[in-house]
Amino acid sequence: MAKRIVILGAGESGAGAAVLAKKQGFDTFVSDMSTIKDSYKNMLNERGIEWEEGKHTESLILNADEVIKSPGIPNDAPMILKLKAQGTPIISEIEFAGRYTNAKMICITGSNGKTTTTSLIYHIFKKAGMNVGLAGNIGQSLAYQVAEYNYDYYVIELSSFQLDNIDRKSVV
């Protein structure tokens, strides 16, 4: 039986993680307490990924082998606390995506200048003829790009929230 991956949050990060999880053959489920944008619903539906919005159904989440948490969900949210209490691994979309690519990752974080620096590095790589993707807080999620493209490099803008739930420091 396939490993069950639950993604909490169905924005850019969560939807991208779901696409990659499904492509890797996982039993994939997405849950979002808010309304999911139609474009993300379409992305999930086109790939046969189950999802729910406006709630977190415990019976569909607490049976996960691993959870990918979107960066906007606080670490002290009730569902996160329940998952932690039962020992379910909780990771970020960035860490999950890093498992499925051999691309080199150039990650930019900090208080000021992230977007400018990330864009500048991306454009330098692109102009140099490198096969490069732009991810993180800019453009499509890293997980989506890993699922759909085959880049040699990724230039990634990371907020402090996106650094949460990354255990494998070698990923970034």
Language-model segments: residues:
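N-terminal leader/targeting and accessory segments in enzymes
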Residues: 1-92, 96
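Phosphate-binding loop of NTP-binding sites
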Residues: 23, 59-62, 71-172
